From Swiss-Prot:
Membership in a protein family: Belongs to the CPSF4/YTH1 family.
Entry annotated with the keyword Magnesium: no
Taxonomy of the source species: Eukaryota, Fungi, Dikarya, Ascomycota, Saccharomycotina
Gene Ontology terms, MF aspect: RNA binding; zinc ion binding
Record protein name field: mRNA 3'-end-processing protein YTH1
Protein source organism: Debaryomyces hansenii (strain ATCC 36239 / CBS 767 / BCRC 21394 / JCM 1990 / NBRC 0083 / IGC 2968) (Yeast)
């Protein structure tokens, strides 16, 4: 009986077609999607970071995919885009897609083994802008969310270095925001001129009223 080893040459699997480098360079064809990430690749400098370039056997993760969520098709083994997928091909529990069953029903039958993200339905309700300003007339019947926060003492003094990342609330006092806004020199000069003109008119009106009062007193006293 003819054996298979006698028919197939042992070096056959090492043979490469001429078009394979093109497929490897353009489409990453034949590469394992679960291969490790290249430690030399720098997304900010992709052309001069990895010495192997596009022929590197490891994965080059672009910076545009660093903040994406995990690919739901990759979780099921059905994604065909490989490295060209817009979503992450890695198990990152913080960037998992949302569990549709939990979002619709409020519970999940796979808990706690579910790999998808369970988002609290209350967190999807937009915050109440009136409550953030200090008072909401609708009270507990308000359709929006009332978030109780402590005012930032640094923000109340004028400036908070943490900005939007601060754990405390930064209230916006819209009534005085225009007065606190830093204005260009031209606007400041115009505003000063308006104030000066207004004060001059008031002084002139006061002077006219005083002079009219004096003339009336003289007329009443008579000669």
């Amino acid at each position: 009986m003819l054996q298979l080893n006698q028919v197939i040459h042992p070096d056959t699997r090492n043979k490469r077609f001429k078009f394979e480098p093109f497929l490897l360079k353009e489409y990453n064809f034949g590469l394992d999607p679960d291969r490790p990430v290249c430690q030399f690749y720098n997304p900010s400098n992709p052309n001069n970071s990895c010495p192997n370039g596009s022929l590197c056997p490891h994965k080059h993760v672009s910076s545009m995919y660093s903040n994406k969520i995990v690919c739901k098709h990759w979780l099921r083994g059905l994604c065909k885009k490989n490295d060209h997928c817009e979503f992450l091909h890695e198990y990152n529990l913080r960037k998992m897609p949302e569990c549709l069953f939990y979002s619709k029903n409020g519970f999940c039958t796979q808990t706690p083994e579910c790999l998808y993200l369970h988002v609290d339905p209350q967190s999807k309700i937009p915050p109440c802008s009136s409550y953030e300003k200090g008072f909401c007339p609708d009270g507990p019947k308000c359709a929006n969310r009332h978030i109780r926060k402590i005012m930032c003492p640094l923000w109340l003094t004028g400036f908070c270095p943490k900005g939007a990342e601060c754990d405390y609330t930064h209230p916006r006092f819209e009534a005085i925001i225009d007065r606190l806004r830093i204005k260009p020199d031209e606007d400041a000069v115009e505003e000063k001129e308006k104030v000066a003109n207004g004060s001059d008119k008031e002084d002139q009106n006061m002077a006219d009223a005083t002079s009219n009062g004096n003339t009336e007193e003289k007329d009443e006293s008579g000669p």
